[in-house]
């Protein structure tokens, strides 16, 4: 594909869904960011293609009145920041205009929260993005997956598929997360939080 270009005067936003590439990870809790990115691509009316200079899967278009580039890194979670950093540099997107969509162990299953900056909560993808951008001050769409019960290792838990009961709710959760992302793009952080955090 031709490299996506942003027309003069457009306000660039970079939305990144975090996950691991490959069919083996497609239905895991850690890949809910990819699931939301896929839904955003549908709303943009286009399909992901490989962006040659960054290596990420990308699609671009307009949502909520703003131009945006939606990306899914094609390397593994703990190295996903490399491709995010490249895209930000290539399209001159500041960290404040980057939105990372990711799973969150510290939120109950299905809860959606928006924030700017903060810690990584043990999330290797967020850690990689922060290292690549040189700052933690990027926006996040946090999607709750809950914590494992008993002594199960959280690192193993996030790489497991959603349970059958959870899977029935995942499409609705992803739709709400995509809606939250559009609100964040269109309204800005605080107004979007006022809407989303009341859900």
Curated annotation (Swiss-Prot):
The EC number(s) this enzyme carries: 3.1.1.29
Catalytic residue list: 30 (proton acceptor)
Gene Ontology terms for molecular function: peptidyl-tRNA hydrolase activity; tRNA binding
GO cellular component: cytoplasm
Residue(s) at site: Stabilizes the basic form of H active site to accept a proton: 103
Family, similarity comment: Belongs to the PTH family.
Stated name of the protein: Peptidyl-tRNA hydrolase
Organism phylogeny: Bacteria, Bacillati, Actinomycetota, Actinomycetes, Mycobacteriales
